[in-house]
């Protein structure tokens, strides 16, 4: 079984590394547009195989999509970071063009693949890939909620001094400031988190989660890569091994939660077919209001893409 990661930067290379270490696929292809870059990263990862004791083959390719043919899953991390002076619309146009080009070539060589988008702005780039791929929406989805939830759980584990393994949580909505936390659905070994932590402290952890990506940027001067790469690999594993895992995923909504024609983070079941079910939670009025506010923010950005010539539906 083959899995491809497009984009050999920090996130893509980390994803490939995790896939290899956990032997999630027999063959892992790392592809990048920069000459020799993916080959170098792939070789470096492969040279850890005798140390980490895995058999997954890791190879690199410079923009040769024929090497990706027959991939069960393709992770797309390609895109440029927002630079000083660059408007939001400029960033959307640039990265949508990149995602469109990549998606076209991915589908040409792997028409039955599932596509996991990691490129930012996440929700709208997933939409761009869906418009380009012209396949069922259950096969094109985005990684955001797995990362955001991992951050939330890790912060709670620090505050409560418990194992992060015992914390279960769900976040919904867009990736970023408009994400929707659901403390009612956050538990520690089945115990509601609201019984273990004061509301003020919980709210502070939620705010830290919303700004989690920015916190890393402020410390490093660049975006995170370990957690995003591992989060993408976890989604790939759920698909490849048909695990039926329940993950918050950027999915195409067609009436669920009263929302239509929008990519938004919601709980889903991930298995060999991609998104096998969108799970509708019973939200209270406050949670619904936050979700609709988040949806409106995402819809605004999607409309920016709709008004561009970058991608035609």
Locate the predicted segments by residue.
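Extreme N-terminal starter segment of soluble prokaryotic enzymes
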Residues: 1-3
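Glycine-rich Rossmann-fold phosphate-binding loop(s) that bind the pyrophosphate
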Residues: 8-9
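N-terminal Rossmann-fold NAD(P) dinucleotide-binding loop
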Residues: 12-13
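Conserved N-terminal Rossmann-fold NAD(P) cofactor-binding segment
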Residues: 33-71, 300-306
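Rossmann-like NAD(P)(H) cofactor-binding subdomain of soluble oxidoreductases
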Residues: 87-153
């Amino acid at each position: 079984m083959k899995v491809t990661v497009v984009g050999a930067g920090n996130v893509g290379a980390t994803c490939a590394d995790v896939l290899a270490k956990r032997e999630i696929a027999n063959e892992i292809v790392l592809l990048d547009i920069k000459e020799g870059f993916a080959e170098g990263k792939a070789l470096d990862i492969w040279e850890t195989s005798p140390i980490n004791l895995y058999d997954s083959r890791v190879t690199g390719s410079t923009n040769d999509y024929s090497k990706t043919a027959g991939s069960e899953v393709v992770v797309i991390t390609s895109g440029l970071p927002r630079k000083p002076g660059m408007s939001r619309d400029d960033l959307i146009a640039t990265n949508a063009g990149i995602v469109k080009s990549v998606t076209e070539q991915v589908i040409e060589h792997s028409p039955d693949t599932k596509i996991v988008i990691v490129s930012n702005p996440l929700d709208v780039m997933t939409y761009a890939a869906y418009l380009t791929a012209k396949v069922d929406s259950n096969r094109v989805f985005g990684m955001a909620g797995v990362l955001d939830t991992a951050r939330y759980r890790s912060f709670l584990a620090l505050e409560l001094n418990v194992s992060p393994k015992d914390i279960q949580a769900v976040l919904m909505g867009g990736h970023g400031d408009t994400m929707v936390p659901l403390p009612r659905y956050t538990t520690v070994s089945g115990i509601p988190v609201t019984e273990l932590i004061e509301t003020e402290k919980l709210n502070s952890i939620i705010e830290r989660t919303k700004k989690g990506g920015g916190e890393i940027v402020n410390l490093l001067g660049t975006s995170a890569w370990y957690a995003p790469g591992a989060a993408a690999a976890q989604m790939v594993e759920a698909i490849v091994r048909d695990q039926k895992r329940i993950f918050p995923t950027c999915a195409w909504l067609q009436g669920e939660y009263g929302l239509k024609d929008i990519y938004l983070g919601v709980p889903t079941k991930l298995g060999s077919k991609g998104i096998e079910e969108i799970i509708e939670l019973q939200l209270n009025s406050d949670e619904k209001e936050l979700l609709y506010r988040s949806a409106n923010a995402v819809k605004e950005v999607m409309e920016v893409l709709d008004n561009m010539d970058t991608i035609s539906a």
